[in-house]
Structures are given as structure tokens and as C-alpha cells.
């Protein structure tokens, strides 16, 4: 029988035929193999992690002192207390986007409006009145669009139909203004074509009136001078006028 490993006494000398196996029993040196880079023991950049763009702020062990130097006597500034409430400009132009300075109108207030202007009513208005009415409609549509956006942002859930009906009436008025101006432009173009055929109108003239009143030729006017006492009979004056006489009282 082969003796066990425990019964073998360790001796300082190893037999010659056991030398190769004894070398294998020893711990063979292992080569280090790693794809990871060597980790640095210390970061030489003292400002690492402090970025004004990324806003990372201070490092853990970095402190920020606002105290002045010793002996200077300067104290840190103190914030000024707010004594008045900022209200803004009461007559600012942006308030026109909100009716009565309210964020949104109630459906009852939104539905309080009249009908649209008709073309027949706008024909009697001059250019300045049509110009003012047009920009009133533009401002009203801007106000309605602002209320629509605010109503969607607040998720109010009311007033959309009233807002749409009011906007439709404003658009009908603006369309009537455009139709009125189209009629006037068409009438102007037709008048220009007629003026080109009229010999008494010179459209190329820019230094004076383009219309020259023609002189009346071939018309004779007979003048008869009478005193008021000479008209004893009314029929005499009527007869003279019918004959082409021009009566001048002296």
C-alpha cells in the first residue's frame, strides 16, 4: 500500500526523481492582465467639479467665505426690505389684451355683443371711420385669442363657444369693411376710365387742377335794365325771361 500524505515526514532533502513534481506544487507566478486603465491616486486639478456652465457648484470639502479680510472692517451687504408692492403701470398698452383687466371673461359677459356691420351701413362711413373700425376689430380678435389661450392653460372648461361666436361676428364686420373698400376701388377705377375719355379732364397734369371747365360758346345773353317801378305787370318779367333776357334791377 502507498502511504498517505499525512504519514510522510517532511524532510529537507527531496529525492531526485521527485524534483519535477515538487516544482509544480509550488505557487507559480501569475501574470496580471486587465483592460481597465490604472486609477489615479489623486486628482491634481483643484477646480475639478466646479463649472459655471453646468452649475455643479462647490466640491464637498470646498468652502466659500464672504467675510472680509481681517482689519478691513467691511461687512457683508444686507438685502433692502421691500416696502411697497409692485403693481406696474396702470395705463400700460398690454392691458388692452384683457377686457376690464380680467384674465378671462364669464360666458355671460362674453355673449354680450351686437350684430355685425353690414355693407350698406359702411358705405356711408368715410375712410377714417373705416380705418378705426378695422383696428378695433383687430384688437378685439387679439383679446379673444388671448382669452382662448388662458382658458386652455387654466383648463377652465367653459366659455369656448361664446368666444367662438363673438369672434365670428367680428370677422363678419371685417369682411364687410373689405367689401366696402372693394366697391369704392371699383368705382374709382371706372371713374378713371371715364375721365380718360373726357376732353375737359387732363389726368397727366400734376401742377394744378386736372379738370378745366369749358367755355360756353354760341350763347348770347340780352340784358334789359328796368327799375322796380317799371314792372307793373308780372307777365312782363316772365315774357322777358322766356325770350332769353337777363333782368337786372337798378
UniProtKB/Swiss-Prot annotation:
Pfam families named among the record's database cross-references: MRP-L47 (PF06984)
Keyword flag Ion transport: no
GO CC annotation, single: mitochondrial large ribosomal subunit
Disulfide bonds: none
Location within or outside the cell: Mitochondrion
Residue intervals passing through the bilayer: none
Region (Disordered): 66-86
Residue span of the annotated presequence: 1-24
Subunit structure, interactors included: Component of the mitochondrial large ribosomal subunit. Mature mitochondrial ribosomes consist of a small (37S) and a large (54S) subunit. The 37S subunit contains at least 33 different proteins and 1 molecule of RNA (15S). The 54S subunit contains at least 45 different proteins and 1 molecule of RNA (21S).
Family, per entry: Belongs to the universal ribosomal protein uL29 family.
Name recorded for this polypeptide: Large ribosomal subunit protein uL29m
Source organism (scientific name): Phaeosphaeria nodorum (strain SN15 / ATCC MYA-4574 / FGSC 10173) (Glume blotch fungus)
Taxonomic lineage from the root: Eukaryota, Fungi, Dikarya, Ascomycota, Pezizomycotina
Amino acid at each position: 500500500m502507498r502511504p498517505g500524505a499525512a504519514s510522510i515526514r517532511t524532510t529537507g532533502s527531496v529525492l531526485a526523481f521527485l524534483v519535477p513534481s515538487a516544482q509544480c506544487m509550488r505557487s507559480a507566478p501569475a501574470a496580471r492582465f486587465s483592460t481597465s486603465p490604472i486609477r489615479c491616486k489623486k486628482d491634481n486639478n483643484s477646480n475639478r467639479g466646479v463649472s459655471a456652465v453646468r452649475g455643479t457648484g462647490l466640491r464637498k470639502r470646498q468652502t466659500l467665505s464672504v467675510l472680509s479680510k481681517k482689519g478691513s472692517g467691511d461687512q457683508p451687504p444686507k438685502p433692502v426690505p421691500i416696502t411697497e408692492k409692485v403693481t406696474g403701470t396702470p395705463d400700460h398698452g398690454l392691458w388692452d389684451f384683457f377686457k376690464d383687466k380680467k384674465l378671462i371673461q364669464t360666458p355671460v359677459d362674453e355673449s354680450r355683443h351686437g350684430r355685425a356691420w353690414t355693407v350698406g351701413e359702411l358705405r356711408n362711413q368715410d375712410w377714417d371711420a373705416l380705418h378705426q373700425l378695422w383696428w378695433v376689430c383687430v384688437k378685439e380678435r387679439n383679446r379673444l385669442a388671448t382669452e382662448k389661450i388662458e382658458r386652455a392653460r387654466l383648463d377652465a372648461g367653459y366659455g369656448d363657444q361664446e368666444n367662438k361666436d363673438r369672434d365670428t361676428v367680428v370677422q363678419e364686420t371685417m369682411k364687410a369693411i373689405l367689401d366696402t373698400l372693394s366697391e369704392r376701388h371699383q368705382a374709382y377705377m371706372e371713374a378713371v376710365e371715364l375721365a380718360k375719355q373726357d376732353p375737359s379732364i387732363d389726368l397727366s397734369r400734376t401742377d394744378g387742377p386736372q379738370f378745366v371747365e369749358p367755355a360756353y360758346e354760341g350763347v348770347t345773353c340780352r340784358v334789359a335794365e328796368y327799375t322796380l317801378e317799371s314792372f307793373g305787370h308780372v307777365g312782363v318779367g316772365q315774357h322777358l325771361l322766356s325770350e332769353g333776357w337777363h333782368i337786372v334791377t337798378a
